[in-house]
Regions:
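N-terminal leader segment of winged-helix/HTH proteins
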Residues: 1-43, 101-103, 110
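Alpha-helical linker/hinge and terminal dimerization helices associated
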Residues: 28, 32-35, 39, 71, ...
Length: 153
């Protein structure tokens, strides 16, 4: 049985797919990624690399599994991000028994404040486009939805 989408309305969007959650989520992701990538590119990082670096700088010794859960990324993606950051000399892995722990190097710790500044610059651009309150509410709704979808997997 097909479920009708109550959001379907010619005025709802300029796209005929504007009532599709998958389409809307990807359109939003592309739009904010353009903003985020531009800011983090100044540091030679993608936004995913920047978030991972920030995590291990703020909370040293996390496992790749914990990073995967925190950043909503697959374990294989986390491994690729760690490898790239290792190549840049920004993080290091340390075996501990059967686990592997990830730490920011001294160079990673030095770069972490610039990552935080880029993060703030991105937020300012998002809030300027949407309005502060709408940006806060949208962020909360997106994270809540991501957590629900992750729990359902």
């Amino acid at each position: 049985m097909e479920t009708a989408n109550p959001l379907v309305s010619p005025a709802a969007s300029t796209s005929r797919y504007g009532a599709c959650l998958l389409f809307a989520a990807n359109a939003l992701a592309r739009a904010v990624t353009v903003i985020g990538d531009a800011e983090f590119a100044k540091l030679g990082l993608s936004y995913s690399h920047a978030y991972l670096l920030n995590e291990v700088a703020e909370q040293p010794g996390q496992t790749p599994t914990a990073l995967s859960e925190t950043l909503f990324l697959s374990p294989s993606t986390i491994t690729r991000l760690i490898e790239k950051l290792e190549g840049k000399g920004l993080v290091r892995r340390q075996p501990e028994g059967k686990r592997t722990l990830v730490f920011a190097t001294d160079a990673g710790q030095v770069l972490a404040p610039a990552v935080a500044t880029a993060w703030q610059e991105n937020w300012a651009k998002f809030a300027n486009s949407l309005g502060e309150e709408e940006a806060i509410q949208l962020t909360r709704q997106i994270i809540a939805a991501a957590e629900k979808f992750s729990a359902a997997e």
